[in-house]
A protein has these predicted regions:
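Short, conserved alpha-helix that lines the donor NDP-sugar binding/gating region
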Residues: 44, 48
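RNase H-like nuclease fold core
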Residues: 1-43, 53-60, 136-146, 153-157
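RNase H catalytic domain
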Residues: 6-13, 49-125, 129, 152-156
Length: 157
């Protein structure tokens, strides 16, 4: 599972790109999505979640290959599980981390970090998909992110 997320501005319009590659069958699928206002870390994490949600079988061994230290370190350094044990108190993107954990607990997942813009073919393709999605005119709304912005500005429901 190759992933990348980006935002043009942080926050700003963003997108993610995903390549799913089934090693056994050789089948390759791509997906991407754009959002009106979001952050780079939300898009990095959303890319992983979108890829995991596309898996048709469960449980399965999954290698997530990403240029996101945010995602890799949270898993490999076990920060995510510490955050979970504390109820994600004061953690950014807790809505997405909770969604990620649902899939993490279903599958056997490892993460592999790749250096950004280092001629890694699949990472470059995911970057292209993410950037292209961020430029589409029919982008989605990242409701949770926008709700959090309004709450911080004092516009609570």
């Amino acid at each position: 599972l190759y992933t990348d997320g980006s935002s043009r501005g942080n926050p700003g319009p963003g997108g993610y790109g995903v390549i799913l590659e089934d090693i056994k069958s050789g089948v390759i699928r791509e997906c991407s999505e754009g959002y009106k206002l979001t952050t780079n870390n939300r898009m990095e994490l959303m890319a992983v979640i979108a890829g995991l949600e596309k898996l048709n079988i469960s449980p399965v061994d999954v290698e997530i290959i990403t240029d996101s230290r945010y995602v890799c370190d949270a898993v490999e350094k076990k920060w995510l599980f510490k955050w979970e044990s504390k109820g994600f108190k004061n953690k950014k993107n807790k809505d997405l981390w909770k969604r990620f954990l649902i899939h993490f607990n279903k599958h056997k997942i490892i993460t592999t970090w790749v250096k950004v813009h280092n001629n890694h073919r699949q990472n470059e393709r995911c970057d292209f998909l993410a950037l292209s999605a961020s430029k589409k005119t029919n982008k989605k709304t990242d409701h949770e992110y926008e709700k959090n912005i309004q709450t911080k500005m004092g516009f609570k429901d």
